[in-house]
Amino acid sequence: MAAEKQVPGGGGGGGSGGGGGSGGGGSGGGRGAGGEENKENERPSAGSKANKEFGDSLSLEILQIIKESQQQHGLRHGDFQRYRGYCSRRQRRLRKTLNFKMGNRHKFTGKKVTEELLTDNRYLLLVLMDAERAWSYAMQLKQEANTEPRKRFHLLSRLRKAVKHAEELERLCESNRVDAKTKLEAQAYTAYLSGMLRFEHQEWKAAIEAFNKCKTIYEKLASAFTEEQAVLYNQRVEEISPNIRYCAYNIGDQSAINELMQMRLRSGGTEGLLAEKLEALITQTRAKQAATMSEVEWRGRTVPVKIDKVRIFLLGLADNEAAIVQAESEETKERLFESMLSECRDAIQVVREELKPDQKQRDYILEGEPGKVSNLQYLHSYLTYIKLSTAIKRNENMAKGLQRALLQQQPEDDSKRSPRPQDLIRLYDIILQNLVELLQLPGLEEDKAFQKEIGLKTLVFKAYRCFFIAQSYVLVKKWSEALVLYDRVLKYANEVNSDAGAFKNSLKDLPDVQELITQVRSEKCSLQAAAILDANDAHQTETSSSQVKDNKPLVERFETFCLDPSLVTKQANLVHFPPGFQPIPCKPLFFDLALNHVAFPPLEDKLEQKTKSGLTGYIKGIFGFRS
């Protein structure tokens, strides 16, 4: 219980007292989203329409409430901790709204929702939030239990707590004040959580009984209401169907494995408790079959397979390839490709470790048989061939998706970059690199048919790579370069057509070269027309620019008319500004040439008088006695 207090944003203790214990922490974390959550608690939460149908009885849309809350508060991204914090905050607000607090900050007073309190359906919602909070904590611990096995015990404890709250909700709904639909939903909810708990305990019989009960109730509810209301119930039935089949298989129904394999191919695959268990089940089934597998034949040579992990991978190879072909969505295909490549890499690593100890096998060449490698090395080459071929198929599938996106002229979206031919060029570069690695596999150097087959595949992908390089040149109007590349595409494609007679079966899965030839021919015609139009446009632009772009402002060419679009822009060339410099007459300069020839009157008499006055005159001048 104490661990639940670690939830950021408010998580209280376990049990019915969780809402009161989350008071301090919950208010801080819930203020951001508190507006909507407060509105949920100020009115009866869901079931108002049902109240009218069943008179004054209480109604609660249990499945609808939990699905909407989960989608809006973290479970869309698998964030169980966020959803758990939301449940704690909503509990606290419900208790505050209903005045059903668990004491105060100084003293805890435990309270339970009883049948006498059922005057408002929010009391039922309070118990539902208790169960949801415990369930979300269990799912959070399940994510962490992969790295910390000790947390599995805590996970089971939280699931038991969730079942306890669900049973309490079911008991309250048995009251005459609650309508029949809510009673059925409470029973289905309890059966669902109980089934999950039994599933974790590997009590398959009890789990399948609980899941079947849940499925039956939801199917009955779906058939009793309109199609819009039945969508949620049908979704829940689809969610628990894989769990039912898994339990049936563990009880002894061997036919269930085929249905589980088909469920894995559906969009999104399986989720929750079943995802990891289903992968483990498939591996376990293949391991049982691997005991009968002792050898594998590839390109006319049979080699023994003694490594169990390699046997399991080779047994599932055909199933994996069929699953990729049958996949409904691109996301599922990509997930299956990645899973297959991961298994193949693991098998190659095991074989590589077996090759290290034996020095003779590290030399790869058997004495007396040049060009022939050991069985273990040949098996390594076979697994590498599978890995590279799968990588080529995955990249080819991605290239097809990008080609479809290029053909669909979608509006520009700033948030998402539209695909470009350069993206396809990169994919085909990777494919060609994988083909080069295939040619270098040990043990296949003398296989002329294999070398020829890979050479033809290389020509096919080179043709497509050249085609998209030409497309990228067309986008930047480099017509001559694009035309040369189109001719190169036709050259590669014609070589494939001339040499593909004996390899049609191996090339049937590759892109159609004849279709590429037709497309290139049409593109060449379009390119030549576009080049001619572009040349005419360039000539007209040069002619008009020679008439207009002569650096003359409008004020100097009033006498000639030219359509100049720049005149209506902010950089219109109307006048020279600032004006240019022009020569003007300067101010005349006068020189006094007669000054040197003028004789001025003598001043000696005045200078003598000033000299005679001396000190006496100076003193008189100071005191003002000078006349």
From Swiss-Prot:
Highest rank taxon of the organism: Eukaryota
GO biological process, one term: SRP-dependent cotranslational protein targeting to membrane
Keywords noted in UniProt: Acetylation, Cytoplasm, Endoplasmic reticulum, Nucleus, Phosphoprotein, Ribonucleoprotein, RNA-binding, Signal recognition particle
Composition bias, Gly residues: 8-33
Modified residues (N6-acetyllysine): 452
Residue(s) carrying Phosphoserine: 48, 241
Residue stretches of biased makeup (Basic and acidic residues): 34-43
GO molecular function, one term: protein domain specific binding
GO cellular component: cytosol; endoplasmic reticulum; focal adhesion; nucleolus; ribosome; signal recognition particle; signal recognition particle, endoplasmic reticulum targeting
Residue numbers spanned by region Disordered: 1-53
Annotated region described as RNA-binding, given as residue ranges: 52-252
Main location per the UniProt record: cytoplasm
Localization per Swiss-Prot or TrEMBL: Cytoplasm; Nucleus, Nucleolus; Endoplasmic reticulum
Effect of residue 86 to A: Loss of interaction with SRP72
Region (Required for interaction with SRP72): 588-610
InterPro entries: SRP68 (IPR026258), SRP68-RBD (IPR034652), SRP68_N_sf (IPR038253)
This protein's domain notes: The N-terminus is required for RNA-binding.
UniProt function note: Component of the signal recognition particle (SRP) complex, a ribonucleoprotein complex that mediates the cotranslational targeting of secretory and membrane proteins to the endoplasmic reticulum (ER). The SRP complex interacts with the signal sequence in nascent secretory and membrane proteins and directs them to the membrane of the ER. The SRP complex targets the ribosome-nascent chain complex to the SRP receptor (SR), which is anchored in the ER, where SR compaction and GTPase rearrangement drive cotranslational protein translocation into the ER.
Disease per record: Neutropenia, severe congenital, 10, autosomal recessive: A form of severe congenital neutropenia, a disorder of hematopoiesis characterized by maturation arrest of granulopoiesis at the level of promyelocytes with peripheral blood absolute neutrophil counts below 0.5 x 10(9)/l, and early onset of severe bacterial infections. SCN10 is characterized by infantile onset of neutropenia. Anemia and thrombocytopenia may be transiently present.
Family per similarity comment: Belongs to the SRP68 family.
Subunit structure: Heterodimer with SRP72. SRP68/SRP72 heterodimer formation is stabilized by the presence of 7SL RNA. Component of a signal recognition particle (SRP) complex that consists of a 7SL RNA molecule of 300 nucleotides and six protein subunits: SRP72, SRP68, SRP54, SRP19, SRP14 and SRP9. Within the SRP complex, interacts (via C-terminus) with SRP72 (via N-terminus).
Protein name from the UniProt record: Signal recognition particle subunit SRP68
